[in-house]
């Protein structure tokens, strides 16, 4: 299983970003992170590419720690909810972001419902 995931990550890191999802991802970022709107277009693009690298690194950490990709997606959901995004805003951000980063297979196969994510978020945020 670990080898399969590492192979996917290697393949993903060798592919280019999916520009079809860039505009949607930028719009969704602006909905949660108001300061994002103050960046120039090239700064936004750089920030998204950096975010893709961060997501890939976080996924590797989760895999190395023996955690599931479902748990990794829960972490990504919580991260943006803690920043003030509504459940719908976070879901609307994560899907185009993961597609932009070339991680569409991960989110399609391992995403539980929004209700599931929010229920778990409420448990930990008390």
Indicate where each model-derived feature is located.
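Classical Sec-dependent N-terminal signal peptides that target proteins to the secretory pathway
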Residues: 1-18
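Terminal low-complexity, poorly structured segments
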Residues: 2-6, 35, 44, 69, ...
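Immediate post-signal-peptide N-terminus of mature secreted/exported proteins
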Residues: 16-53
């Amino acid at each position: 299983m670990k080898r399969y995931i590492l192979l996917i990550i290697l393949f993903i890191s060798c592919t280019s970003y999916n520009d079809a999802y860039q505009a949607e991802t930028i719009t969704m970022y602006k909905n949660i992170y108001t300061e994002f709107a103050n960046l120039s277009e090239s700064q936004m693009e750089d920030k998204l590419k950096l975010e893709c690298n961060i997501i890939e690194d976080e996924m590797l950490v989760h895999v190395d720690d023996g955690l599931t990709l479902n748990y990794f997606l829960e972490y990504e959901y919580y991260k943006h909810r803690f920043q003030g995004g509504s459940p719908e805003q976070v879901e609307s951000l994560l899907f185009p972001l993961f597609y932009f980063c070339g991680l569409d297979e991960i989110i399609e196969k391992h995403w539980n419902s929004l209700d599931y994510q929010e229920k778990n978020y409420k448990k930990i945020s008390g």
